[in-house]
Amino acid sequence: MDNLAIFEEFNSKKISQDDLEATIISLNNYFVKLNDLNNQYLNLIRQDNIDKSKKQNIKIQRKNTKIEINKIIATTKLFKQNIKLAESMYKKIKSSNNQDDIKKAQLEVDNAKSMLIQFKEAINGQGKSIKLKKLNDVAIEIKNLSFKYGPEFPNAIDDVSFTINQGEYVTIIGHNGSGKSTISKILIGVLNAQQGEIRIFGNIVHDHNIEQARKFLGIVFQNPDNQFIGSTVEADIAFGLENKRVDPKKMPDIILDSAKKVGMEWALKKEPLNLSGGQKQRVAIASTLALDPDIMIFDEATSMLDPKGKREIKEIMVQLRETRTKTILSITHDMDEILNADKVIVLDHGKLVRVAKPLDIVEDKEFLRNIQLDVPFVGLVREELEKKGIKIASTQNIDELVEQICKK
């Protein structure tokens, strides 16, 4: 049998890296389920009047979950067999004296041993060592999420559920205290919800894998001054890349490309403190883009900027939307900003009260005023024109509004 045939036979039987990751994901999900069941059980037995049937049901679920975990742990022997398979293949290849093939075969042996180590680490760490993959095209899925800042406080987030698909531009709006920014803090792991489930591209997010889940996310905060670390724009963009352990040889191209996307390539050698508010925020966006997150969260990213700065950031967000390569979640109380979104999620006192297209929200002026939100400028102009008997068709921005008025 020649070397090619030996490799083909080995490849048809070996455990691949994808097989390992799928196994660890399954293990991870069972550990999450077991942890949830344990918490349910503890909460139940603390109650004065214990529901015995519910208690028994949880005990059965815990037992079954442990059985599934043990089944997966038992596959350790398969990873050991995989090493033997690789070593057997290596011996056959070694006899050929083909140095390139011998190196290739040795790499397969090393990979097989590495996979066993990774699997054992996953068992010891309850699955937290897994590198998360996209399991579906739902960028963010939130189910029955609730959070309060302390037992004496009401829910800041109260049984909220929604989904955001990959490539969508979604805004979350609400008055101060509605829970908008609390959701962003929960998404990035700064806060832990007391109830509910968050999935990022199908992966359940929990304490064990939050660091991995964060790699899907990039966030731009309200105050650009709080986001700078480097002494120059270039150094600031490089900081995140260094933490990510990006190859230093690749960094200059990544930095330049990210700066160009926000029109700040001219400022790479400048100090961030000497830039305007809008320019600083553009650098903050460039720093986030350099890390190439799948989901970009803008948390009140325009609220501290002057009108020119606001316009610049909104234009960048629209450009990102047009590529459909990033999922954009914009948390804002700027009602003019929602007009650029694919859909709008409305919160009021921690509750989700509406999910709709921007124009549907803008047209419902009574709804906006009832939940203490401003009517966008285009909506106010249309309202005043209608009072004077001038009817204008629904418009999504000021340019469309001017065009409609000119036709009258």
Swiss-Prot record:
The keyword Flavoprotein does not apply. Residues 140-374 form the ABC transporter domain. GO terms for molecular function: ATP binding; ATP hydrolysis activity; ATPase-coupled transmembrane transporter activity. SMART domains: AAA. Its EC number is 7.-.-.-. NCBIfam families: ECF_ATPase_1, PRK13648.1. This is Energy-coupling factor transporter ATP-binding protein EcfA1. It comes from Mycoplasma capricolum subsp. capricolum (strain California kid / ATCC 27343 / NCTC 10154). The lineage of its organism: Bacteria, Bacillati, Mycoplasmatota, Mollicutes, Mycoplasmataceae.
